């Protein structure tokens, strides 16, 4: 039997833990996915692979297949672009240097934003640190959670649309590479790059940019995601069919108390197999 057929679906390839902006440790993320019927899962924390070992061990104990992953931050003009990076080599020098730079920028940004917010609201740095776990890089979601905990906003959504909104008095932009560079780094690290939620509220990226990303090694698009919208979604369906690209579906789960639930969108077995076959950076962890 081919190696790529050793896994079992359903497969959810976009899950976050407390190592980035999720609320649960990696082991609990795997347990939550298992309770929702997921049998192959990828941990894709933002700009870090630090949760892989714990997630892999937990997945094995649950007879699940673990797909090592990451969600690499990128930026096109004013817009954030997220590149799902499956089965990369975590020790690749180029990718590692970039993720370290992004994480450092995220911490600096969080401190500056916290200082700005503290001028007008009853919020201190320790309130934000209380929302993080060991090993996590403090980011905007943790500031949002601190605002919720202090009763300054109702939920993360209100924080992101108000106090933390881009262009607002307290906002500071995060350093991130352009999407073509990000895709090239993932591909260069032996990984399989897939654009996350590509037809969301911000609309599609320019066709010329998508073409450049494809030339840099982009493998596909996450079309199964609650944020995607028509008509952009149909445009991408057509593109994926014409270019024979990988199509994924995922929950983008961030933990308990968040709306996205594991397994609400899944990836077809044939597409998971293509990801595994294409990757050279690392390998799935089978039960």
For each feature predicted by the language model, list its residue ranges.
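An N-terminally biased module of ancient metal coordination in phosphate/nucleic-acid-related enzymes
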Residues: 1-79, 164-165, 183-184, 189-203, ...
């Amino acid at each position: 039997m081919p190696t790529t057929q050793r896994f079992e679906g359903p497969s959810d390839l976009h899950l976050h833990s407390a190592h980035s902006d999720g609320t649960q440790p990696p082991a609990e993320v795997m347990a939550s996915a298992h309770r929702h019927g997921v049998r192959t899962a990828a941990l894709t924390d933002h700009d870090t692979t630090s949760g892989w070992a714990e997630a892999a061990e937990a997945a094995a104990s649950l007879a699940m297949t673990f797909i090592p992953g990451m969600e690499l931050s990128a930026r096109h003009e004013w817009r954030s672009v997220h590149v799902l990076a499956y089965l990369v080599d975590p020790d690749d020098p180029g990718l590692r240097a970039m993720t370290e730079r992004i994480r450092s920028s995220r911490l600096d940004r969080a401190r500056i934003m916290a200082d700005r917010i503290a001028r007008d609201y009853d919020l201190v740095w320790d309130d934000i640190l209380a929302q993080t776990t060991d090993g996590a890089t403090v980011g905007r979601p943790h500031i949002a959670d601190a605002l919720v905990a202090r009763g300054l906003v109702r939920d993360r959504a209100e924080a992101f649309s108000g106090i933390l909104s881009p262009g607002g008095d307290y906002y500071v932009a995060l350093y991130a590479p352009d999407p073509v560079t990000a895709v090239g780094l993932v591909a260069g690290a032996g990984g399989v790059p897939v654009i996350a939620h590509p037809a969301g509220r911000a609309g599609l990226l320019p066709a010329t940019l998508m073409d450049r990303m494809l030339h840099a090694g982009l493998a596909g698009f996450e079309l199964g995601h609650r944020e995607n919208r028509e008509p952009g979604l149909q445009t991408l369906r057509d593109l994926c069919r014409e270019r024979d690209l990988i199509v994924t579906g995922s929950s983008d789960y961030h933990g308990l108390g968040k709306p996205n639930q594991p397994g609400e969108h899944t990836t077809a077995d044939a597409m998971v197999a293509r990801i595994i076959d294409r990757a050279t950076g690392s390998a799935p962890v089978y039960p």
